[in-house]
């Protein structure tokens, strides 16, 4: 499985955890991530670990390229949850995120469930 991690800062702990689930490529720019998808094909999941407008910019870049790639946005600002829906993020998590939450959500995205529960509503973890 190929996972894209989009963040301006190094996320060693999260990267190590995601590496247990698949091959991880880290990008500090949404444009570079979309370029990699154009060149090598879409990722199995994209994880955006940026707060506020930066996270929104990453999501806009990803969704501008693909409406289908599973997208998880993690932010420390819960008030951006409505924007995550507008950006069509499959799941929005509020920091701090436990290792269990990250593993479960990414695993679900990789399995193609894309963050939806039985009723088809988006799941939000806080």
Where in this protein do the model-derived segments appear?
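Alpha4-beta5-alpha5 "output face"
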Residues: 63, 82-86
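Conserved phosphotransfer microenvironments
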Residues: 14-15, 33, 39-66, 77-78
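Two-component/phosphorelay signaling modules centered on CheY-like receiver
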Residues: 2-35
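C-terminal output helix
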Residues: 97-106
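The C-terminal output helix
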Residues: 107-122
């Amino acid at each position: 499985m190929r996972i894209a991690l989009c963040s301006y800062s190094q996320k060693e702990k999260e990267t190590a955890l995601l590496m247990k689930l698949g091959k991880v490529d880290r990008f500090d720019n949404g444009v570079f991530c979309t370029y990699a998808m154009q060149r090598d094909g879409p990722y199995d999941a994209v994880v955006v670990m940026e707060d506020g407008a930066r996270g929104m910019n990453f999501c806009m870049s990803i969704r501008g390229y693909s409406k289908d790639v599973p997208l998880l946005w993690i932010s420390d600002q819960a008030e951006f949850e409505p924007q995550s829906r507008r950006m069509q993020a499959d799941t929005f998590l509020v920091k701090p995120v436990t290792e269990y939450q990250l593993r479960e959500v990414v695993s679900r995205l990789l399995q193609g469930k894309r963050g939806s529960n039985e009723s088809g509503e988006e799941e939000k973890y806080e």
